[in-house]
Regions:
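Juxtamembrane inter-helical linkers in multi-pass membrane proteins
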Residues: 183-201
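C-terminal functional regions that serve as terminal interaction/effector modules
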Residues: 2-15, 208-282
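N-terminal juxtamembrane cytosolic/stromal segments of multi-pass membrane proteins
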Residues: 1-28, 63
Length: 282
């Protein structure tokens, strides 16, 4: 009887575990779509700025505050915030369970560390989106504020430098992934028609190259912060876009980067719909 009870309990636990997997997948898919929406909106604002039509070079914080001032903005902020929570949960699963089989060699650990950093960043963005939607303030999580707090800690400069290296490494990985079109291997292409495959390939390639370049610039800013111990050197997407705009032919560079981020947003929505998501043991 005791053995039977234990076996029954184990079977129910396994069944419950299997039943939760589709829900976690849905959260992850919704999360990819929410992330895509964030990049698409940032890209739109940057493109309008490049065209002189009233947009602005902004990161996630500025974009969320801009959205809050629009009709139905608070509803969209709630959707983005909840969606990004799903994205964070899926990134944590990728770090711990390694469903993509990245492994434990140097390359695999760097990639999984990138997922961990991504989970932290998007967790902060989700909190900020929900805070603004609840009229609870901006949440105060800018790169400069975070860097200043880290610099005040023991080994703070080393930590910031390590974060910068991870971000650059992940940015280069995005560049390679986009250029080689390896991301298409993650899609359930048998469920996509020819038009959807074409859009996924084009938007993913250009979008990942643009995002990879922006991430590499952000990582470089973090390393500058570590070297100079000056938190003002830390910049996010807005700083990277402003840096591009300050160069010769800056408006053209800004426009290209903005278009790339918009394409990454489109890719994110397609990714949420068609990416193969497994737990490795399925």
């Amino acid at each position: 009887m005791e053995y039977s009870a234990k076996a029954d309990a184990k079977q129910k636990a396994n069944q419950a575990k299997q039943e939760t997997k589709p829900w976690i997948r849905r959260l992850g898919r919704y999360g990819y779509m929410a992330q895509g929406t964030v990049y698409f909106l940032i890209g739109i604002l940057a493109l309008l700025a490049a065209l002189g039509l009233g947009g602005k070079m902004t990161g996630t914080s500025g974009m969320l505050e801009t959205v809050a001032g629009k009709p139905f903005g608070e509803v969209l902020l709630w959707l983005i915030g909840i969606g990004l929570i799903g994205y964070v949960i899926w990134e944590i699963i990728k770090v711990i369970k390694d469903p993509e089989n990245k492994g434990t060699d140097a390359k695999g650990l760097l990639t999984r560390a990138g997922y961990a950093v991504s989970a932290i960043i998007y967790g902060a963005i989700a909190f900020k989106a929900i805070s603004i939607a609840m009229h609870a303030g901006s949440g105060g999580g800018s790169e400069k504020t975070i860097s200043a707090k880290l610099l005040a800690q023991p080994f703070g400069q080393w930590i910031i430098g390590l974060v910068g290296i991870i971000i650059i490494g992940y940015g280069l990985y995005e560049l390679y992934n986009g250029y080689s079109e390896r991301f298409m291997n993650k899609f359930r292409v048998s469920e996509m028609n020819q038009h959807e495959r074409k859009i996924a390939r084009k938007s993913g390639k250009m979008g990942m190259i643009a995002r990879g370049a922006v991430l590499a610039m952000i990582g470089y800013f973090f390393i500058l912060t570590a070297i100079t111990a000056n938190p003002d050197q830390s910049k996010g997407i807005d700083g990277a876009l402003a840096e591009l705009a300050s160069k010769p032919y800056g408006q053209w560079l800004l426009g290209i980067a903005a278009a790339g981020l918009m394409l990454y947003g489109i890719y994110g929505v397609i990714r949420g719909r068609y990416e193969h998501m497994s737990f490795g043991g399925k």
